[in-house]
UniProtKB/Swiss-Prot annotation:
Conversion of fibrinogen to fibrin is triggered by thrombin, which cleaves fibrinopeptides A and B from alpha and beta chains, and thus exposes the N-terminal polymerization sites responsible for the formation of the soft clot. Cleaved by the protease thrombin to yield monomers which, together with fibrinogen alpha (FGA) and fibrinogen gamma (FGG), polymerize to form an insoluble fibrin matrix. Fibrin has a major function in hemostasis as one of the primary components of blood clots. In addition, functions during the early stages of wound repair to stabilize the lesion and guide cell migration during re-epithelialization. Was originally thought to be essential for platelet aggregation, based on in vitro studies using anticoagulated blood. One of its GO terms (biological process) is blood coagulation. It is found in: Secreted. The modification Sulfotyrosine is found at Y3. The keyword Coiled coil applies. It comes from the Eukaryota. The gene is FGB. This is Fibrinogen beta chain. Signal peptide: none annotated. GO terms for cellular component: extracellular region. Heterohexamer; disulfide linked. Contains 2 sets of 3 non-identical chains (alpha, beta and gamma). The 2 heterotrimers are in head to head conformation with the N-termini in a small central domain. Keywords: Adaptive immunity, Blood coagulation, Coiled coil, Disulfide bond, Hemostasis, Immunity, Innate immunity, Secreted, Sulfation. The lineage of its organism: Eukaryota, Metazoa, Chordata, Craniata, Vertebrata. Transmembrane segments: none annotated.
């Protein structure tokens, strides 16, 4: 499971990539 977290426009965007 790949966990990516990046901040954009002052908001926190968390995306999960299933492998």
């Amino acid at each position: 499971l790949d966990y990516d977290h990046e901040e954009e426009d002052g908001r926190t965007k968390v995306t999960f990539d299933a492998r």
